[in-house]
Amino acid sequence: MLSGRLAQAARAAGISAVVVPMDGFHLANTELQRLGTAERKGAPDTFDVDGFVNLLQRIRAQATATVWAPVFHREVEESFAAELAIKAHHRLVIVEGIHLLHTAHGWERVFPLLDVAWYLECLDVDQQRARLVQRHIAHGRTPKQAHVWVNTVDMANMERIAATKHRAHTIFELATW
């Protein structure tokens, strides 16, 4: 992922950096099933946005303590708490996720907590769709299930995300993904 490469480059330049993905704040599958939203996992309202905002506030206010964050594991489609350590010495915190610019469901509280926001736009939607299908297949879905998921859930997310790109400080257009 680009966020990991940016953190690696920063560290190579002597800047302590950490990547904080919003994916750790996916609601648990059992909770998504209880809420009836499991079939749309990844939509803005299927995350613990309050927990994510709280994490960002804690990081910004951090003086000396370590702030712990959950990490999402795609191979089991669940998050594990307190797996990522954000330390006070981290000078660069790269926050990564698809809903950082969203303006509803509580996500509007995220943008003011970011010093800068970049939007990465893949100009080849067919390539992006194909990569998403392959990712879903690699994590256990059948090709048919992967295509259905991408054409319903993922494409709806992509449209929702694209509608907020104007909020980004910089938009990077990527010819290939």
Residue ranges of model-derived segments:
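Short helix-capping segments at alpha-helix termini
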Residues: 10-15, 139-141
